[in-house]
Regions:
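Histidine/acidic-rich helix-loop-helix segments that form or flank divalent-metal centers
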Residues: 8, 104-140, 191, 236-293, ...
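Histidine- and acidic-residue-rich, metal-dependent catalytic cores
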Residues: 169, 173-176, 198, 227-256
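Divalent-cation-assisted or electrostatically stabilized phosphate/pyrophosphate-binding catalytic cores
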Residues: 39-40, 91-102, 164, 210-236, ...
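Conserved N-terminal diphosphate/IPP-binding helix and adjacent helical/loop segment
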Residues: 2-34, 38-45, 143-146
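A short mid-domain helix/strand-loop element embedded in enzyme catalytic domains
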Residues: 137-158, 162-173
Length: 324
């Protein structure tokens, strides 16, 4: 950051680093699903956000509500407002559950932002997700896989399962809100920047850095063509004002010179790298971790019986030949 001392830059690095464990959990919303509706939690939040914006809700309100829900979901997963209300929990108890989950992970978020987000954890009536009207590009981004890890001149490294663009955009939008105070940015603006930064991929398949390099000086024209297609859909669904706001944030994130650009680009690069950490963590996962670190056979009335069965089956870490 310009005009800051080394000590200030070090402190800023520490504050961003403090958020990484929370970001890792929030990012897992790309991989959590429920039975009653299709798509990951992140994909559903992307669809919900666009539906709210297109029906005229203020960007700031959508940004705060969806970011608060994403933080609470770090521990609650798919146990969201609608699920808890359908189970018969009173509204005040639903609020307590949501805030308990939020508080369990939100400590690294600056206190002033944390308190404002927490206020948005309220059980508002929700429309069935399948009935939410959204522009066509929202569905296409949900179907468009991310390219993964590519580099010109090298074979493509395909990582499975791929995240989709709706999941990535939603995660970046939430990260950017959580980083907004650090960079002096407005939460609503950085949230919208996250939602719109891959609009062109609604029509342009993601071939990564490798494919883009093959387009050479035609890359900009191709991206502009498909971005305009999505923006036209957005204007038809949400009006000219929403389109203008989207265009403003697209211009703003062409660089990292201003507060919006810095918060957005910090969120974007963190999500890209944390996604790679996810693949690495998944590939190195062991049964020992499940049993010992994650307490797979957890406390309860039948824990001792479970452990005795695993011992007889030679499936405990203490037994020789474990895992064979």
């Amino acid at each position: 950051m310009r005009g800051t001392s080394e000590a200030e830059r070090a402190a800023a690095r520490d504050r961003v680093g403090d958020l990484v464990p929370l970001f890792t959990e929030v990012g897992d919303a790309k991989r959590v699903r429920v039975a009653h509706t299709p798509g990951s939690l992140a994909e559903r939040a992307f669809r919900r956000s666009w539906a709210a914006l297109c029906r005229g809700e203020a960007v700031e309100s959508v940004a705060r509500r969806e970011s608060a829900r994403a933080v609470a979901a770090a521990r609650l997963g798919g146990l969201d407002v609608g699920t808890l209300l359908r189970a018969g929990l009173p509204k005040d108890e639903v609020v307590r559950v949501l805030r308990r989950s939020f508080d369990a992970v939100a400590e690294p978020v600056p206190e002033s932002l944390r308190s404002r987000l927490r206020e948005f954890l309220v059980p508002e009536p929700e429309e069935p997700e399948g009935s939410l009207p959204v522009p066509d590009f929202v569905q296409r981004l949900a179907r468009q896989p991310r390219a993964g890890c590519t580099r010109p001149g090298r074979p493509r490294l395909v990582l499975e399962p791929p995240e989709n663009h709706a999941e990535h955009c939603m995660t970046v939008a939430v990260y950017a809100v959580l980083l907004s105070e650090e960079f002096g940015a407005e939460p609503g603006r950085v949230f919208l920047a996250g939602l719109v930064h891959h609009l062109h991929n609604a029509g342009m398949p993601d071939s990564g850095f490798t494919g883009e390099a093959m387009l050479g000086d035609k890359l900009g024209a191709v991206m502009d063509r498909y971005r305009e297609e999505a923006l036209t859909e957005l204007e038809a669904s949400g009006g000219a004002e929403l389109r203008r706001a989207a265009e403003r944030e697209i211009r703003e994130i062409e660089t990292a010179d201003g507060p919006t650009g810095r918060a957005f680009h910090a969120a974007d690069v963190l999500d890209r790298v944390l996604q790679m950490h996810h693949y690495a963590r998944e590939a190195s996962f062991t049964v020992d971790q499940a049993l010992e670190e994650m307490d797979l056979v957890h406390d309860g009335p039948v824990k001792s019986f479970h452990e005795s069965v695993l011992a007889r089956a030679n499936l405990t870490p203490a037994n020789d030949g474990y895992g064979r």
